[in-house]
């Protein structure tokens, strides 16, 4: 109530703001985050911002996700990325792969890059808290689905650890082994799933395999702050039929293959990360994002000789996203 509606450029802002909830105070001027102690002082509930030269925004309850200001890049060092033009003189103009987009204010499009304070420390780390908007949650367009930039092991970023979907050749149990590597609610305490009990369905949206094995009524994600991406969500990214079994069906969504062998080297093994979705026609297969081929594929769920990891997906209310 004591915040002035206008202030003359060059003046100082000096107001009392009581923080009873122990939120992190964040002050922005002209949409740039100011540094406490340098750009402003906040001592004993008194906020002082000197030399005002633009619009001021003050947050106690910060958005969980805010737009990235710098995009992640990787250098193409293998035939897969080279083959689609990431090389000097190639179709992409250089050997540098840029992941995602900075987007347009007020709009959300697949691949828009965000930094999300998932651990609740008040810091938006562009290196380890990078996410990409995929789509709105099915049946709830107030919630955004965002995918992490990296695979994880025990909830922390890891490029070179791989896990089975399930430990034996039976996909009808669900991805219980892969799920166990997702960030827990203690690790990513600032985000939560809209539903922690999820219905497991195959690529056709049905609840059993072609040979009659029923999937569990619910997958219990109650210990986890994130989940796996689904085949249904991938299908919504393109107007073409998926799976097409053709390389490059996801070339318009390369943010899905950041930090995989797509950019790094030649590799004859399947690589990428698991989707939540079991395959209907093969009850020992689960679907994956096949990263080097930029498409979906299916792999035996129990295999340990494939480079298939776990990549978290978070669900965030659009009210908690600055876009």
What positions do the PLM features span?
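Conserved N-terminal submotifs of small, disulfide-stabilized extracellular modules
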Residues: 1-9, 63-66
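Conserved "repeat-terminator" motif of extracellular CCP/Sushi domains
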Residues: 41-66
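Collagenous Gly-X-Y triple-helix signature in extracellular proteins
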Residues: 66-75, 79-323
């Amino acid at each position: 109530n004591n915040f002035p509606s206008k202030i003359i450029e060059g003046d100082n802002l000096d107001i009392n703001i009581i923080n009873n909830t122990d939120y992190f105070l964040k002050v922005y001027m002209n949409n740039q985050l100011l540094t406490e102690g340098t750009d402003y002082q906040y001592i004993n509930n008194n906020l002082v911002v000197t030399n005002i030269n633009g619009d001021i925004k003050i947050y106690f309850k910060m958005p969980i996700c805010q737009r990235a200001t710098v995009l992640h890049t990787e250098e193409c060092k293998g035939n897969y990325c080279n083959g689609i033009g990431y090389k000097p003189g190639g179709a992409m103009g250089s050997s540098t792969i840029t992941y995602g987009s900075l987007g347009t204010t007020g709009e959300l499009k697949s691949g828009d890059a965000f930094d999300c304070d998932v651990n609740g420390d008040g810091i938006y780390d562009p290196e380890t808290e990078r996410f990409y908007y995929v789509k709105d949650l099915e049946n709830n367009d107030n919630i955004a689905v965002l995918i992490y930039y990296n695979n994880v092991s025990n909830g922390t970023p890891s490029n070179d650890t791989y896990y089975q979907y399930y430990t034996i050749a039976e996909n009808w149990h669900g991805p219980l082994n892969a799920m166990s590597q997702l960030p827990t609610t203690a690790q990513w305490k600032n985000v939560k799933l809209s539903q922690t009990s999820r219905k497991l369905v195959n690529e056709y949206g049905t609840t059993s395999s072609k040979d009659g094995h029923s999937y569990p009524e619910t997958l219990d994600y109650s210990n986890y702050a994130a989940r796996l991406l689904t085949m249904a969500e991938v299908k919504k990214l393109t107007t073409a039929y998926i799976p097409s079994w053709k390389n490059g069906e996801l070339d318009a969504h390369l943010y899905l293959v950041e930090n995989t062998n797509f950019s790094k080297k030649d590799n004859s093994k399947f690589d990428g990360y698991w989707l939540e979705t079991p395959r209907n026609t093969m009850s020992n297969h689960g679907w994956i994002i096949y990263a080097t081929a930029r498409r979906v594929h299916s792999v035996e769920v129990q295999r340990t000789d494939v480079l298939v990891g776990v990549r978290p997906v978070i669900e965030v209310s659009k009210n908690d996203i600055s876009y």
